[in-house]
Amino acid sequence: MKKTKTILDILKMKSDGEKITVLTCYDYATAGIMDGCGIDMILVGDSAGVVCAGYDNTLPVTMEEMIYHTKAVMRANPKALVVSDMPFLSYQIDLATARLNAGRLIKEAGAAAVKLEGGLNVVATIEAIVAMDVPVMGHIGLTPQSLHRMGGYRVQGRKDEQAEKLLADARAVEAAGAFAVVLEGIPMRLAERITRELTIPTIGIGAGPSCDGQVLVIHDILGLCEKYSPKFVKQYVDLKPIMAEAINSYIAEVKGGAFPTEGHSFH
């Protein structure tokens, strides 16, 4: 029987030079498909607020929503390592609040690890959560919960001063005890340097091919997002017309009396 991946497996993948595959997931059915394909990590992202709930950004997402989505994913009994996002205001207020909410994602929702955004500014938070024996994944660069400070979704680290700040953030996140770090929306050469200097895995999203792993939003690779698709996204299939064809066929058959047939009925 295939064993469930742990953070030790993910760390070993970096040392072995094996690329780490990560996708977001928010529901039971998709988690089962994903896990059957052998994905290494599942990220229950606060991006659920955008792709599932229709919010303009991730800021409105609540702890209750993250627990709901994480529980749904965990019911598929995935062998992938499941990481749950800590939403905005779940860890920024104080360390006690951060510890409580991280613990809820593990105890109530069933995740194996949590992810939070920030660098030097969240070192104490990462340390406090790790001290509870809760694994933490960091997230630096383009951090969606900081979109107002950044003036929107902009590539970070193009200037030398910004690049050095991000390198310091990456080192700080590792030193604080994170087992991995997401690098989002940064120049590929900077991501390559960070990946080379850290002992923990880097998971890229819009950070080039040199990261130890890659993560994308599942709705993006399936062509299910109606909103703007960033440059770093690769759409592997366009499911929208396939879904529309099935729905249109259903509507036509019901309207025309072709469904249900006797074979779909009880006697």
Curated annotation (Swiss-Prot):
**Which of this chain's residues are annotated to bind Mg(2+)?**
46, 85, 117
GO CC annotation: cytoplasm
Q: Which domain of life is it from?
A: Bacteria
Instruction: Please give the cofactor(s) recorded in the UniProt entry for this protein.
Output: Mg(2+)
**Gene giving rise to this polypeptide:** panB
**What organism is recorded for this protein?**
Geotalea uraniireducens (strain Rf4)
- Describe the reaction catalysed, as an equation: 3-methyl-2-oxobutanoate + (6R)-5,10-methylene-5,6,7,8-tetrahydrofolate + H2O = 2-dehydropantoate + (6S)-5,6,7,8-tetrahydrofolate
Q: Which GO terms describe its molecular function?
A: 3-methyl-2-oxobutanoate hydroxymethyltransferase activity; magnesium ion binding
Q: Which family does it belong to?
A: Belongs to the PanB family.
- Where found, per UniProt? Cytoplasm
Q: Where is the active site?
A: 184
The name under which this protein is listed is 3-methyl-2-oxobutanoate hydroxymethyltransferase
Checking InterPro entries in the record gives: Pantoate_hydroxy_MeTrfase, Pyrv/PenolPyrv_kinase-like_dom, Pyrv_kinase-like_dom_sf
On assembly, the entry states:
Homodecamer; pentamer of dimers.
- Cite the annotated pathway: Cofactor biosynthesis; (R)-pantothenate biosynthesis; (R)-pantoate from 3-methyl-2-oxobutanoate: step 1/2
> Keywords in UniProt for this one?
Cytoplasm, Magnesium, Metal-binding, Pantothenate biosynthesis, Transferase
